[in-house]
A protein has these predicted regions:
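Structural motif corresponding to the intra-repeat A-B loop/turn of tetratricopeptide repeats
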Residues: 15, 48, 87, 121, ...
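Short coil turns that delineate tetratricopeptide repeat
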Residues: 32-33, 66, 105, 139, ...
């Protein structure tokens, strides 16, 4: 390809005009396509959310490279496997990854991808075998890749949890945490497996000791707040934990959770104040507000403020389209419940 062609392709890519990248490459005769162009075309389809054409692009080039056919095909099968896994087609993804393995690929990336895939296919023992192999391989291939080590240890912990091997799960979750993982996912999985092995009170003690030692960790405070609120129904401690988490992070989700805790404590006026602040942050960040609207409607019902209760119920109803499908029925039932309560005011 001439320099002008590549300038055009690069400009379109930098501007996010991936439809134009596709159009330019599709104009080319088939014999002009090489692995570089196939890669760009496939990635452009992915950026457009067109995973089917991305997959077809990669599959169509298998066996057609003019040189290094085996290496190119390994890359193509690997890419197809990764792509299928990204869209949740783990069965097909595994087939493509196995094809890459048959051609000779046997590195950390492939084993990690296959381990994750097998886990999602409810084949945890096989997944663990692959992931443990990955841990050994990464020490040889990229010992400095901490993020990948965190991921592998987290997946091994998760699959052990699936198998109800909580002691073994904890071992790997602790490693992931010590390597730097600090999110709700790791803390909730630590909670579940600590609860299974030591009981709720001991599990709670672990988290309370952790926040004492890491008082500035907003994520840890948020996780503790969730434990207080959802496991122990201790809304007073939950409210204080979420307040601390928000003070450290400024994350509106912590403010929202604090508002829920205040509502559950019956402190409706304070809850309204906090939920309105949370809603303002959500609007500023372009986020949905259906959760705040629903809880505001509940608070205004409790305060016998029919006008505002109706206002936020209507806003919550408008947000129904943003609710994940698996929660839509529950959300609609809650809307109807609040509507009935408003009618009685």
């Amino acid at each position: 390809m001439d320099e002008k062609f590549w300038e055009k392709i690069n400009t379109f890519g930098e501007n996010g005009e991936f439809d134009k990248v596709v159009r330019e490459i599709k104009k080319l005769p088939e014999d002009k396509l090489d692995i570089e162009l196939i890669n760009i075309l496939g990635r452009s389809y992915m950026n457009l959310g067109d995973y089917e054409n991305a997959l077809d692009t990669y599959l169509s080039f298998i066996g057609k490279a003019k040189e290094d056919v085996k290496d190119v095909d390994i890359w193509l099968y690997s890419e197809c496997g990764w792509l299928c896994n990204e869209v949740g087609d783990y069965e097909q993804g595994l087939k493509y990854l196995l094809e890459a393995e048959k051609l000779g690929r046997d590195d950390e990336w492939l084993n990690t991808e296959m381990g994750q895939c097998l886990g999602r296919l409810e084949r945890p023992e096989e997944g663990l075998e692959r992931l443990k192999k990955s841990l050994k391989l990464i020490e040889k291939e990229a010992p400095e890749n901490i993020d990948e080590k965190i991921f592998i240890n987290s997946e091994i912990g998760f699959l052990n949890g699936v198998l109800e091997n909580s002691e073994e799960a904890l071992k790997y979750f602790y490693i992931a945490k010590d390597l730097g993982r600090n999110d709700n996912w790791i803390y909730m999985h630590l909670w579940l497996n600590l609860e299974n092995t030591k009981g709720k009170e001991e599990a709670l003690k672990y988290f309370e000791d952790e926040v004492k030692a890491n008082d500035k960790n907003s994520v840890l405070w948020e996780s503790l707040g969730q434990i207080y609120m959802n496991i122990f129904q201790d809304y007073d401690k939950a409210e204080k934990a979420f307040k601390k988490a928000f003070g450290l992070s400024g994350d509106g989700l912590n403010l929202y959770n604090r508002g829920i805790a205040l509502r559950l404590l019956g402190k409706y006026e304070e809850a309204v104040e906090v939920l309105l602040q949370s809603r303002k942050i959500s609007v500023q960040e372009g986020d949905v507000t259906d959760g705040e609207d629903l809880d505001l409607a509940r608070c205004y019902v409790a305060l016998k403020d029919k006008k505002n209760a109706e206002k936020y119920l209507d806003l919550a109803r408008e947000g129904l389209e943003n609710v994940p499908e698996e929660h839509a029925d529950e959300f609609e039932a809650t809307l109807e419940e609040i509507e009935d309560l408003i009618e009685k005011l």
